[in-house]
Amino acid sequence: LEDAVSYAEHANNYNIWKYFRDEFPNPYTIEKAKEYIGNICDTNQKTYLAISLHDIVIGDIHVAQQTDILKLSGFLGYWLAEEFWGKGIMTEAVRVFTKYIFDNSEVIRIFARVFSNNVGSMKVLEKAGYIQEGYFKNAIIKEGKIYDQLQYAKLKST
């Protein structure tokens, strides 16, 4: 329960939500946090981790392994409480978690997709060794506005 309270407290932030798919709840309630954490625990997901500071959840990071012909690829997602932005925490989390996934799974390629106006996330990925490999014009609609989307990736061999 403590994790759910902390998770909801930090995830319930417009400046986080505005860069996520609409399925990311807004407002982010304790009930939604319990449901999310419960789903991860029920499926024994080892590729979803909470980012904690002094036993308080301040974000999360996950890689969803793709299926079928894309099964060697993983989709990276993450968020961090706004008060911790710009401190290198997420860059280090992405760097370490990427290595963990490469060392402990069959994944050989990890990719992330970023809104074109999310400069902070682009910097995180670039500092963690990800390379921009795609640019999709008019790919996202959020709050009635259309945005481009960038795709970054890192290969196990690099």
Range-by-range predicted roles:
Residues 15-37:
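Conserved GNAT-fold acetyl-CoA-binding loop/helix
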Residues 13-16, 25, 42, 157:
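Residue-level marker of structural boundaries
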Residues 18, 44-47:
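Amphipathic alpha-helical interaction segments
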Residues 1-5, 10-14, 48-158:
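Acyl-donor (CoA/ACP) binding surface of acyl/acetyltransferases
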Residues 39-45, 130:
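Short loop/turn motifs at secondary-structure junctions and domain boundaries
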Residues 36-39, 139:
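Short, P/G- and charge-enriched loop/turn segments at secondary-structure junctions
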